[in-house]
């Protein structure tokens, strides 16, 4: 280190760091371990040399024996170099331990530094009229001396430890000098067949790969191609899983970018592949873009069975519909729009132009009708209670059945003035032709068609007559009201 950090650290920190560690014990243990390894390697060299010499000098002769002996000689040379390296490591570890012990002895005790600082605080707190100034100066001088002693001890320790470490030969250099190649081309690779730097495993090409057969950088797994992949068989960058093709995929067998799931095709998909088609869909059976739910087609739909754009609900078609079975820009249930002027209606079970039955256009409510449309329960806009001024006359049987109050047009579409097949009348109509409920017409009768009261003997037509009042004819209608006649 050019400028060790301990040079500007106070003695409180340097002393505490030196005395807080385990001391020279680990270094001495390492030196002993390296020494033991050196002895074992030297013994292995001696034993292997003896065995190979016996083989090549007696029972094993010929070219194969010579080839084996050449390789064995290299191996014995490596064992000898390793033994020497281990012995040197043991010696340097012992030197480093000695340097630490020397530095520790030269370092000021932490308790002494703490006492100095405590006394300084007391003197400064009781320095009335400057009486403690000389003592404070002495305490500060002693503190500065402690600082210098700690820095000197650490500097000496740093120099000796650096010299001991620089004397060690790297193990990679020892193996390279011996001519032994075990497939580690590059630097700091661990394994076989690696090419690059920082690879751990086998047959990796690139840098910082963990696993086998990776091509690229920072891959973890097997057979990845690209960078920062985690898993197996990924092609691209930043994939997590198996067999992904693209970048940023999480799962298995995804093709695209940013997919999360299994077997997805496209970008930013979520779910299981084969169920959705398009981009940005979430759910099952969606086609298009940005759909959420099931069996939607189009763009931006949310729900089930929607078609179009920006719909939410069930079975909507068109754009921006909300509810169940609605059309464009509608909300509610079972709406349909066939004209540009029919948008934005809200009802329950309403229909569009030329609708017949229980509903009609531009109506809100339940089972209503309007605009010259007739329904199953209500007649048209100019309906039952308003008579028609120009009702055409039509012949009808004299004994026709009475027309009920709910009689309506027979055709699917009625005119604006209440016209049907023959223009039926309203609830009560004085006109000729087909009559209403009470009609004094000359053609088909209503429920009671006679304009005057019937005689008791002529029951069955007109308005029934009571025998409670005296029998008066039409000419007597202007007479005064008389008391009823008593009959026995």
Curated annotation (Swiss-Prot):
Disulfide bonds: none annotated. Its main location: secreted. Gene3D superfamilies: PPE superfamily. Plays a major role in the integrity and stability of the capsule. The gene is PPE10. It is found in: Secreted. This is PPE family protein PPE10. Residues 207-232, 443-488 are annotated as: Disordered. One of its GO terms (biological process) is response to host immune response. PANTHER family: GLUTAMINE-RICH PROTEIN 2. Belongs to the mycobacterial PPE family. One of its GO terms (cellular component) is extracellular region. Disruption phenotype: Mutants have impaired capsule integrity as well as reduced surface hydrophobicity. Mutants have reduced amounts of surface localized proteins and glycolipids, and morphological differences in the capsular layer. Disruption of the gene is associated with reduced ubiquitin association in cell infection and attenuated virulence in the early stages of infection. It holds the Pfam family Pentapeptide_2. Keywords: Secreted. It comes from the Bacteria.
């Amino acid at each position: 280190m050019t400028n060790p950090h301990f040079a500007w650290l106070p003695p409180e920190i340097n002393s505490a760091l030196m005395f807080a560690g385990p001391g020279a014990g680990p270094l001495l243990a390492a030196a002993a371990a390296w020494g033991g390894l050196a002895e074992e390697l030297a013994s292995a060299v001696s034993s292997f040399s003896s065995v190979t010499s016996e083989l090549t000098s007696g029972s094993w002769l010929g070219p194969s024996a010579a080839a084996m002996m050449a390789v064995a000689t290299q191996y014995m040379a490596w064992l000898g170099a390793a033994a020497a390296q281990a012995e040197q490591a043991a010696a340097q570890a012992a030197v480093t331990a000695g340097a630490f012990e020397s530095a520790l002895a030269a370092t000021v005790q932490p308790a002494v530094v703490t006492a100095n600082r405590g006394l300084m605080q007391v003197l400064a707190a009781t320095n009335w009229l400057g009486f403690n100034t000389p003592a404070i100066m002495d305490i500060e001088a002693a503190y500065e001396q402690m600082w210098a002693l700690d820095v000197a001890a650490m500097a000496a320790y740093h120099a000796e430890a650096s010299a001991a470490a620089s004397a060690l030969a790297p193990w990679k250099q020892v193996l390279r000098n011996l001519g032994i190649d075990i497939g580690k081309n590059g630097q700091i690779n661990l394994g076989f067949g690696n090419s690059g730097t920082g690879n751990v495993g086998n047959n990796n090409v690139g840098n910082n790969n963990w696993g086998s057969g990776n091509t690229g950088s920072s891959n973890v797994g097997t057979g990845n191609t690209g960078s920062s992949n985690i898993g197996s068989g990924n092609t691209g960058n930043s994939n997590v899983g198996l067999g992904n093709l693209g970048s940023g995929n999480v799962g298995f067998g995804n093709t695209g970018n940013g997919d999360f799931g299994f077997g997805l095709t496209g970008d930013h998909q979520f779910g299981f592949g084969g169920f959705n088609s398009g981009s940005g869909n979430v759910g099952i059976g969606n086609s298009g873009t940005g759909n959420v739910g099931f069996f939607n087609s189009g763009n931006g739909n949310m729900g089930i069975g929607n078609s179009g754009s920006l719909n939410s609900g069930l079975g909507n078609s068109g754009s921006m519909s909300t509810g169940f079975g609605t059309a464009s820009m509608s909300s509610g249930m079972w709406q349909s729009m066939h004209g540009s002027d029919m948008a934005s209606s809200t009802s329950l079970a309403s229909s569009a132009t030329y609708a017949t039955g229980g509903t009609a256009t531009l109506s809100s409510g339940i089972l209503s009708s309007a605009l010259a449309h007739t329904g199953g329960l209500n007649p048209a806009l100019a309906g039952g209670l308003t008579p028609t001024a120009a009702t055409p006359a039509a012949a009808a049987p004299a004994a026709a059945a009475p027309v009920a109050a709910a009689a309506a047009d027979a055709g699917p579409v009625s005119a604006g003035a209440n016209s049907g097949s023959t223009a039926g009348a309203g609830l009560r109509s004085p006109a000729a032709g087909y009559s209403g409920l009470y009609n004094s017409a000359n053609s088909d009768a209503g429920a009671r068609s006679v304009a005057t009261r019937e005689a008791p003997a002529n029951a069955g037509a007109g308005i029934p007559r009571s025998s409670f009042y005296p029998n008066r004819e039409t000419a007597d209608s202007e007479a005064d009201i008389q008391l009823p006649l008593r009959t026995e």
